[in-house]
Every structure is written in C-alpha cells, then in structure tokens.
UniProtKB/Swiss-Prot annotation:
Keywords: ATP-binding, Cadmium, Cadmium resistance, Cell membrane, Ion transport, Magnesium, Membrane, Metal-binding, Nucleotide-binding, Phosphoprotein, Plasmid, Translocase, Transmembrane, Transmembrane helix, Transport, Transposable element. Couples the hydrolysis of ATP with the export of cadmium. Its EC number is 7.2.2.21. Residues 3-66 form the HMA domain. It is an enzyme of class 7 (translocase). It catalyses: Cd(2+)(in) + ATP + H2O = Cd(2+)(out) + ADP + phosphate + H(+). It is a multi-pass membrane protein. InterPro entries: ATPase_P-typ_cyto_dom_N, ATPase_P-typ_P_site, ATPase_P-typ_TM_dom_sf, ATPase_P-typ_transduc_dom_A_sf, Cation_Transport_ATPase_IB, HAD-like_sf, HAD_sf, Heavy-metal-associated_CS. This is Probable cadmium-transporting ATPase. Its main location: membrane. Disulfide bonds: none annotated.
Length: 711
C-alpha cells in the first residue's frame, strides 16, 4: 500500500492556486494521489515524492513545504520574516509606474510615447506572474481567473487602452493580496492553538530535573509544573494539588481543581500549586494535537454551499467567456456597431465576470467559524455539520451527564427525632459509616455529604454488617442495630411509625425525581435522606436560550422512571419528556423525530448514546476533552463539561449560514448589476475591476465577522 505523507503549505493564497498545486503534485512521477486541504493549508501526498519535488510543484506561487510533524512542534515555520516591500516589490513598482504614467498623461497627453511606455512597464512588471499562469492555461484551454484577466489585458492593449490595462493588473494584484490576507487571518485561529502548549517541559529523570523538548518526552516521564506555568503534555497528577485553567481546551472560564490521579491537558495553565505529572501521551497524540488535526480536517471538508459554488463556477467561467465574445462581436457584425467600443465592453465583461468573490465566499466563512468554535471549546468536524446545525429544528438530550451532572448527591436530610445538633451529627455519621461498607451506587453520595461537612466517619465501628437484597443494609453500632434502606423496608420494620406525614414527605421527594431512603433502628425512625442526580445549574438557561434561537422542540430522553423524568424535565424546561427508554428506544425515537422535524441533533456522552448520536443529523458529545471516543465519534464535541457551549454553537452555525447566503447573493448581484451596464454602454474596465475587487473584499470581510460571534 502506497505511503501517505502530510505536509503543511505556506503561501497558499487562493482556491485556484490550490487546485493547480494539487494537479502539479499529481503529475510527479511516483505520486498516485494528492489532496490539498485549502482551509488548513495542507497537502496529503500518496506515493513517493521528495519535499523538493513537492515544493517545485508549487514554485509558480513560491510555496514553502514543511513536514506536518515538524511544523506542528515549531510554528515558527509559518512566521513570514520577509519585509512588506520585499514581498510586494512588483506591486509597488507597478503602482509607481502607473502614478508617473498618469502624471505624464496630464502633462503630455495620453498619446505621448513616455505615457504609454510607463503604463506598458506597469503591466509587465505587475502582471508577470498573472501572464505566466494565464498563457499556460490559455494554451491548455483551462479557463481560470488568470485566463480571463490575461485575455482582458491583451485585449485592452490591442485597442490601445494601456492605462486601463495597467489598472486591471494592479487592482487584480491587490484583490489577490486581500484574499491571501483574509485566508491567513481565518487560519490564524488554528495556528494560535499551536502556540498554546510549551515546546519544552521540566522533566525529572534519574533524580535530576532538566528542560526537555516535547518531541523527546516519553510516556511515563514525570513533568514538574510550577505555579504560573503552562502544561506541555497530557498526563495525570502523581503529586501535588492545584487549580488549572483549562479555557484553552474546554472553554471553561473557571479554573478546575486538580488532585492526585486527575487528568491534565497540554496547553492548560497551572495557576496555584506545584504539580508532578506523569505523561500519558506522546506530543502528537495530546488532546490539543487531536483538536488541531480534526479542526484542520474539518476546514478541508466541503460544505454543501461550497460544493454548489465550486460546481457553479466550473460552468460559470466558460459561460462568461462566451458572453464576452458575443458582446464584442455581435453588435459590430450584425448592427454596425463600433468595433473598438464593443470589444472594450466585451473585455469589461471578462473582468467583471471573474468569479473571485464567488469562489472565496464560502471557504472564508467556514474556516473562520470552525476556528472560532475551536477557540471556544467546541470541536466541529466539518463545514457540513456547521450547516446542518444551522438548520436544526429539534434537539434531543440524554438526561444523565448532559442535563444533569451524572453524579448522585444528597439533596435533603430530614431529622425525624428531636435531639441536639451533636446527636443529629452522630446519627448521620452512623448512617454514613454503614454506607461505607455498602456496594450501593448511591452510597458514595451519603459518604461525600458527610466528608464535606468534616464529619469523622472513622470514629464509628460497625459490626455484623448485612446487605438486605433489594431493600437496604443493616449493621450494629455500640450494641444497637441500625438500618438504612427504602421506604418498603421500613414499612415492614416499623409499620406503626410510618405515619401519613412521613409518607407525604417521602412522596414529595420522589415526585421531585429524588430517591428517598430512611435511617433508623427496629424501634424508631431517625431520619429521611434524599439523593438525586443533580441538575446542572446551566441546563434551564440553555434550554430557554435554544428556544429563543429558534429550536422548535427540545426533548429529554432517559432510562429513568417516568416520575423522575417528569420532575427533572419540568425543572429544566424541555418541551417533551420521554422516560423508561432502552438504547434501542432512543434510536427509534430519534428516527421518528427526523421524520417529523427533518434536521435533529442528539446530545449525549458519546459512548452510552452512540446509536442515537449516529442516527441524528448531528451527534453532539459532551466532555470531549476527557474522552478520545467522544472526540473521534461525534460530529461535534463540547470539549468542556459545559452545556452552555451548545447555544453558542447553534448561534455561530446560524450566523455562518446567514453570511454564506449573503456572500453568494452579493457576489452574483454585484456582477449582474455590472453586466447590465453593458446595455447603455456604461461598463468600463475601471468599473469592472472595482466591482470584482470590491465584491471580493466585502465578502471576505463579511466572512471574518464570524471571528467575533459570541453567545
């Protein structure tokens, strides 16, 4: 099987250049396939080719080729050290000749030999690379933007319009420079991610601490991270305690506490204590590396709108050449029109018909939006998903770990006996001590509740511990037998004490979606404790915001009983609640939603909800930073455990769709208006190039507005 090699490409400025570069690389002997990712500025080469050969294939655009791994660990490769003058000397010199040419025209007239000579120099100096490419394409009958411009400039020279020909050259060069700048600006959001993680780390080996480059750090090495330093590699804490700012990866604004065995990510900032971290991944496998790789792949994916534009442009450019030829020849041949006038009009049509603005309208918006999402802790796997999210009508949520925190907590503790606070505390300690010996999934909530209130659970010695299957637990403390269990257990033990008042309290807790347990002896009830999977504080706001953004229906799907589901669903404000569902039921429900609403998203944890996530139009996984599975399988991953990023993603996607539509519409309308100027004979080369350049500038600036989108 042929080997695949990925290179980063510096200097890739336009989609036409990318297509030509791809064709050139495919022609290299030994290469079986080449795919350029214009958004990410990368090329994947299948087969045998040296860097020098690939670079030679891009010599027409002075492209610089860097191996992907080398460029990743050293973003300095992408820093252009050339001065502005050195980079743009042809453009500047051409502009100077044009300025002097117009001065000569004012003083000596437009037919003066020096005036025309200055404009000719301006055309050849400023249009050298344009002509070189245009003539090659013309000989191959490839009708690109360069071909259109070359024909237009030759025609202008042929009818003696040297001044306007020179203006076409310089304004086209300015237009290309603006396109290059806008794409670089859009890509910068991803390149900035490369700078997040340090290139070196303090590593302890054989008892000695030394600075080691990330390429040389191995799995199992111990990194020493001081307060205020960034973490260079993914790993887990083996010593120390601190708060780590994970905003760069997850978008979380509040630092996250880190203790022994907690995971940390490359590119995050250690804010407080000294940490010793065992490295768990190589530099190319860190979470930030995966994010960069997947985002760049996403930027290379063609969105439906982009596919439409590319197909349209393929037929549009030859059509413009035919229309221009007809305008130039039909009026003089059939209606006795002036040849010079109509040839000039035809040349103007060639220039105004250049599809620069149309071609760049979609990629600049997609690349910018995906980059903005990544910087805010949202990984979108491609332009197609960005467009799909923008058209969502319904969103389904898994309950556990999505709308709720996924961790049981004690929500209520009700004492049923009159006693001092000291006795109340002792009662709770006895109950928690019993739960320490239990395997019940809710036991951890009772223990943690006691620990957070600094209760000494080790002070109690439990004897004769027994589990009562399906009902609760029993144990002896200081000669007294205590029980913790369900209401059913205590109805059997203490039927006479299970009063209407206690029954009401238990029922009220259960109606709120909580699990009620009782604590007591075989002689008296002591307390009621309620445990629940705590609803995220942000869930209600998120659901409300989604409805404001135009999501018609929000649905909570859960395997919990209907009473618990209703309690939590009503609390967060979803429009529909479905309980007691198996994974297959969730899958069937998503399929039905798609029939009813068309485009549907499913939000879950990326593992348990895999079938439903896969069936949805867009599968959105929570907490992607903690699981490779979520990053790799979901269409969209919310990197932090933060549901509030969902409304931001919907808003960004809808704004992206809006801007793409604006760009395509504006690009076509501005050209149509300019073409209509042919009828009264008002279209000039000046107007044509200004319409083309102006449209390109406006659509790129409009696309770059997506950098500023926030929720």
């Amino acid at each position: 099987m042929a080997e695949k090699t990925v290179y980063r490409v510096d200097g890739l400025s336009c989609t036409n250049c990318a297509a030509k570069f791809e064709r050139n690389v495919k022609e290299i002997e030994g290469v079986t396939e080449a795919i350029v990712n214009f958004g990410a500025s990368k090329i994947t080469v299948t087969g045998e080719a040296s860097i020098q050969q690939v670079e030679q294939a891009g010599a027409f655009e002075h492209l610089k080729i860097i191996p992907e791994k080398e460029s990743f660990t050293d973003p300095e490769h992408f820093t252009d050290h050339q001065s502005f003058i050195r980079k743009n000397w042809r453009l500047l010199l051409s502009g100077l000749f044009i300025a002097v040419g117009y001065a000569s025209q004012i003083m000596n007239g437009e037919d003066f030999y020096l005036t025309n000579a200055l404009f000719i120099f301006a055309i050849f100096i400023g249009g050298y690379s344009l002509f070189k490419e245009g003539f090659k394409n013309l000989l191959k009958f490839e009708f690109t933007m360069e071909t259109l411009m070359t024909i237009a400039i030759i025609g202008a020279a042929f009818i003696g319009e040297w001044a306007e020909g020179s203006i076409v050259v310089i304004l086209f060069a300015v237009s290309e420079a603006l396109e290059r700048y806008s794409m670089d600006k859009a890509r910068q959001s991803i390149r900035s991610l490369m700078d997040i993680a340090p290139k070196e780390a303090l590593v302890r080996r054989s008892g000695t601490d030394r600075m080691v480059h990330v390429d040389d750090i191995q799995i199992g090495d111990i990194m020493i991270i001081k307060p205020g330093q960034k973490i260079a590699m993914d790993g887990h804490v083996v010593k120390g305690y601190s708060a780590v700012n994970q905003a760069a990866i997850t978008g979380e604004s509040i630092p996250v506490e880190k203790n022994i065995d907690d995971s940390v990510f490359a590119g995050t900032l250690n804010e407080e204590g000294l940490l010793e971290v065992a490295v768990t991944k190589r530099v190319e496998d860190t979470t930030i590396s995966k994010i960069i790789h997947l985002v760049e792949e996403a930027q290379g994916e063609r969105a439906p709108a982009q596919a439409f534009v590319d197909t349209f442009a393929k037929y549009y450019t030859p059509a413009i050449i035919v229309i221009a030829a007809l305008i130039a020849t039909v009026p003089p041949l059939l209606f006795g029109g002036n040849w010079e006038t109509w040839v000039y009009q035809g040349l103007s049509v060639l220039v105004v018909g250049c599809p620069c603005a149309l071609v760049v309208s979609t990629p600049v918006a997609i690349v910018t939006a995906i980059g903005n999402a990544a910087k805010n802790g949202v990984l979108v796997k491609g332009g197609v998903y960005l467009e799909e999210i923008g058209g969502l009508k319904a969103i389904a949520f898994d309950k556990t770990g999505t709308l709720t925190k996924g961790v049981p907590v004690v929500t209520d503790y009700i004492e049923l006996t009159e006693a001092t606070n000291i006795q109340h505390n002792k009662n709770y300690i006895i109950m928690a001590a019993l739960e320490q010996l239990s395997q019940h999934p809710l036991a951890s909530a009772i223990i943690k509740y006691g620990e957070t209130r600094e209760m000494d659970l080790t002070s109690i010695n439990v004897n004769d511990f027994t589990s009562i299957t399906g009902k609760g637990i029993r144990g002896t403390v200081d000669g007294n037998t205590y029980y913790v269990g369900s209401p059913v257990l205590f109805k059997e033990l203490l039927a006479s004490q299970f009063t209407d008042s206690i029954h009401r309290q238990v029922s009220d807790l259960q109606l709120k979606g909580k699990t009620a347990m009782l604590f007591g002896t075989n002689q008296k009830l002591i307390s009621i404790v309620a445990v629940a999977d705590e609803v995220r504080s942000s869930s209600q706001h998120v659901i409300k915001r989604l409805h404001e953004l135009g999501i018609e229906k929000t649905i909570m799907l859960t395997g919990d009983n209907q009473a618990t589901a209703q309690a939590i669903g009503q609390q967060v404000g979803v429009s529909e609640i479905e309980g007691e569902l198996m994974p297959q039921d969730k899958l069937d429900y998503i399929k039905q939603l798609k029939i009813n609403f068309g485009k549907v998203a499913m939000v879950g944890d990326g593992i348990n909800d895999a079938p439903a996530l896969a069936a949805a139009t867009v599968g959105i996984a929570m907490g992607g930073a903690g699981t490779d599975t979520a990053i790799e399988t979901a269409d969209v991953a919310l990197m932090g455990d933060d549901l509030q990023k969902l409304p931001f993603t919907v808003k960004l996607s809808r704004k992206t769709l809006q801007i793409i539509k604006q760009n395509i519409t504006f690009s076509l309308v501005i050209k149509l208006i300019a073409l209509l100027l042919v009828i009264p004979g008002w279209l000039t080369l000046w107007i044509a190039i200004m319409a083309d350049m102006g449209a390109t500038l406006l659509v790129t600036l409009n696309g770059l507005r997506l950098m500023k989108v926030k929720d």
